[in-house]
Design a protein with these regions (language model features):
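Short, basic/aromatic recognition patches
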Residues: 1-19
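Structured helix-beta-strand junction loops
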Residues: 13-14, 65-66, 130-132
Length: 147
């Protein structure tokens, strides 16, 4: 049985790239390529898989209706899957106790956990606000794979 540390190790091996899957209202699966990383949940302190998602996407619509996600990372023949419930915070998904400044810092934390770097953080913050980006955190219920 794999652990979240295995996911974290593999995700670093491919620039944070992984496949995130949600359920559409008709029960079919919607998958997309995302950048993700492992970080501490800002409220619970548990280790979670985090990603930044553009506002208005099908992924966010699906997650609001059914807040569960599967994330798979693969490097070569090694892979790890994380399944779990999600927590969303963003301009269109406010959370009590997470103000605009906290969201700005959290967006940066998720981006860097996914291996991201930026030469102009003010520009990064501007784009995140303009795109109404949200933070999606997956709390692992099941972790499995061969990695």
């Amino acid at each position: 049985m794999s652990e979240l540390a295995d996911f974290e190790r593999l995700i670093a091996g491919d620039h944070g790239l992984c496949v995130a899957s949600t359920l559409r209202p008709d029960g079919t699966i919607q998958s997309s390529l995302v950048n993700a990383g492992v970080l501490k949940h800002p409220v619970s302190g548990e280790n979670v898989v985090g990603m930044v998602v553009r506002g208005g996407t099908r992924k966010l619509v699906n997650l609001r209706a059914d807040p569960r996600m599967t994330v798979v990372v693969r490097v070569g023949w090694q892979w790890v899957t994380v399944e779990g419930s999600v927590w969303i915070v963003g301009p269109d998904d406010p959370v009590s106790g997470i103000d605009g400044e906290h969201l700005r810092v959290l967006l940066r934390a998720v981006f860097t956990a996914a291996g991201g770097t930026h030469d102009d953080w003010d520009e990064y913050d501007r784009v995140m606000a303009q795109d109404r980006r949200a933070v999606v955190l997956v709390s692992p219920d099941r972790v499995y794979g061969n990695g």
